[in-house]
Amino acid sequence: MEEGPGFPFFLPKGMILKNQLIDYWRQIHTAAGYQEISTPIILSRKLWERSGHWDHYKENMYTTIIDDEDFAIKPMNCPGGILVYKNKMHSYKDLPLRMGELGIVHRHELSGALHGLMRVRCFTQDDAHIFMTREQIKDEIKGVVQLIDSVYSTFGFKYHIELSTQPEDSMGAKEDWDIATPVSYT
């Protein structure tokens, strides 16, 4: 609709389908040991700067000012998921800790790139954050691949998985990449 270009409107039948997909998502993630979380749509600019997202994505972020402070509508869920994890102390015995979120995200896509429901400015992102020990990396990767396979097979989707390694403009410590990348290959 021209009143909200790139922002989908879901009519009653579309909502029935969307809710069935959400129910399916909850069922398979619960069975795989995920805890569902929800994080705010608007978070402070300071958080986005601290996470590194501001430097990488600010051109695609919608911003606002609240009480003289800069905020942004989230283009991704990661910083919020990290805040949920950091909300309390965890023992290594709590790990792996799997958190899943169907978070609503907004990205300022160029108007020429918009295409039906395939390329929009607001969408629900199936996101997961797994907190684990180094020794658990391999098993957790296997679990994620099995979960992906289960979902894609259910819907008859064909897929191909490739391993992406550290890009030049990556976020995160090089030491963490150096540990995780070789384990991912095995």
Regions found by a protein language model. Name each.
Residues 185-186:
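Conserved small/polar residues in nucleotide/adenosyl-binding loops
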Residues 48-59, 167-182:
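Short glycine/threonine-rich loop-to-helix capping motif typified by GTGT followed
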Residues 18, 22, 26, 138-145, ...:
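Hydrophobic face of alpha-helices
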Residues 1-12, 119-178:
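Conserved alpha/beta enzyme-core scaffolds, especially Rossmann-like or related mixed alpha/beta domains
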Residues 1-114, 118, 130, 149, ...:
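Auxiliary tRNA-acceptor-end handling modules of aminoacyl-tRNA synthetases
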